[in-house]
Amino acid sequence: MFCVQCEQTIRTPAGNGCSYAQGMCGKTAETSDLQDLLIAALQGLSAWAVKAREYGIINHDVDSFAPRAFFSTLTNVNFDSPRIVGYAREAIALREALKAQCLAVEANARVDNPMADLQLVSDDLGELQRQAAEFTPNKDKAAIGENILGLRLLCLYGLKGAAAYMEHAHVLGQYDNDIYAQYHKIMAWLGTWPADMNALLECSMEIGQMNFKVMSILDAGETSKYGHPTPTQVNVKATAGKCILISGHDLKDLYNLLEQTEGTGVNVYTHGEMLPAHGYPELRKFKHLVGNYGSGWQNQQVEFARFPGPIVMTSNCIIDPTVGAYDDRIWTRSIVGWPGVRHLDGEDFSAVIAQAQQMAGFPYSEIPHLITVGFGRQTLLGAADTLIDLVSREKLRHIFLLGGCDGARGERHYFTDFATSVPDDCLILTLACGKYRFNKLEFGDIEGLPRLVDAGQCNDAYSAIILAVTLAEKLGCGVNDLPLSLVLSWFEQKAIVILLTLLSLGVKNIVTGPTAPGFLTPDLLAVLNEKFGLRSITTVEEDMKQLLSA
């Protein structure tokens, strides 16, 4: 086992990365190794997808499957070894079908890629795990060095984050052939084990630029189906009655659940990155979408144990449900998996609803505590002139984008302390689950404009980017000249690709934490600092002083 993709990876003087019987996330060595094997199979599939496009062959089954299966290897998504192997077998079957299509056009069609003809050696998980050793990401570290390995992983993990957003967009009916062609090209190239530093750096920026387009179609998918988010108050306390909790990012799953629970007497609560769903008109119209439950994903083993109803996980993040003994009432959807947990293959939630009706639910309603969400792209752009006016009248000094992933490290209290230290004449724009560090606190307003503005999920960084570009255009300056600072927390691969997106767009002087990614060496961090001004957090006092004086 070798896995260094998330923030909680093991760090030792001898090197970084989980490499024992189990990773810090709870992923076993078996599952981790089989995910490496799956990625190799997906690289071979992409190699043939690139070749097929040369012949004008576009296989939509391949295009929809490839990023979805890649998403299953993202942190805290799928811990179920047999399902990972199932994805690998499906990848090979699709590859062979695509290969046959190519051979029908040109009898001598071939692909020069080491993954292009990969076959699984056995049905036995142990033998497959041994085969997977051939594809462990650090197998040639001694030959290429830590810097090249780090750049490879930056590209691989960044592309994995983009694949997750591609799947979210695809679920909502969004498809862009250029994006999929670019995805396959990059995925296939990474399967050749590239070792050119400049080429890898260029690839990381290409992934960031591609992801900006992915976030654009994801935004289009969400807003075309569910309307543009508008500011909405959400209750974060319990309402009496039977209940279901839904977590993850998949708004379509939430919509289907709301439709199927309407009139049943079962209330629905959002958790984690589902919180922004309350801002969408076509979702909040359901009166039994009664509120948001819990805090950051890392607290789920305590909070889910206390929730008196079933739980549905639609995407990341799931962690071991046996710890809180709620594994008999947590359900996985789509690419999510945990051994022994019931999985919903389709969009029928009747079994979940039946379980909710058999459980007690909340016995009484707590005193409501309301927070505000729903500052989506359209709302943010509508406030651009107000922001400019406040800045020109010196009522608004600075905007801090304070967002990203949450996690378990104690150092993450930095982000709470930072938020509460932001001066009263400054605004906090937040997104993703890092907001749970401070989103239930009171920040007041500046002439009626809330000082805490929740822009949505991690992918809604797109809205923040569009706002920044709009403000810069209106003020006749560059984005880096705005009174705007980005202080981002990271945990997994979606955060990595958001960072690559921002860097590829030329955004500089981003501050990140709580730690640097374990796969980035001091040399690589120095390169990123020199090229983009990217740096790690220090103390709240020092960072605040520096950012306000920039």
From Swiss-Prot:
Record-listed E.C. numbers: 1.7.99.1
EC primary class: oxidoreductase
Names of the cofactor(s): [2Fe-2S] cluster; hybrid [4Fe-2O-2S] cluster
Annotated positions of the Cysteine persulfide modification: 405
Cofactor descriptive note: Binds 1 [2Fe-2S] cluster.
Main location per the UniProt record: cytoplasm
GO biological process: response to hydrogen peroxide
CC terms in the record's Gene Ontology section: cytoplasm
Location in the cell: Cytoplasm
Catalytic reaction equation(s): A + NH4(+) + H2O = hydroxylamine + AH2 + H(+)
GO molecular function, one term: metal ion binding
Segments crossing the lipid bilayer: none
Domain of life: Bacteria
Name of a matching Pfam family: Prismane
Binding positions for [2Fe-2S] cluster per the UniProt entry: 3, 6, 18, 25
Keyword entries, A-Z: 2Fe-2S, Cytoplasm, Iron, Iron-sulfur, Metal-binding, Oxidoreductase
Annotated family: Belongs to the HCP family.
The protein's role, per its UniProt record: Catalyzes the reduction of hydroxylamine to form NH(3) and H(2)O.
Name of this protein: Hydroxylamine reductase
Species of the source: Escherichia coli (strain SMS-3-5 / SECEC)
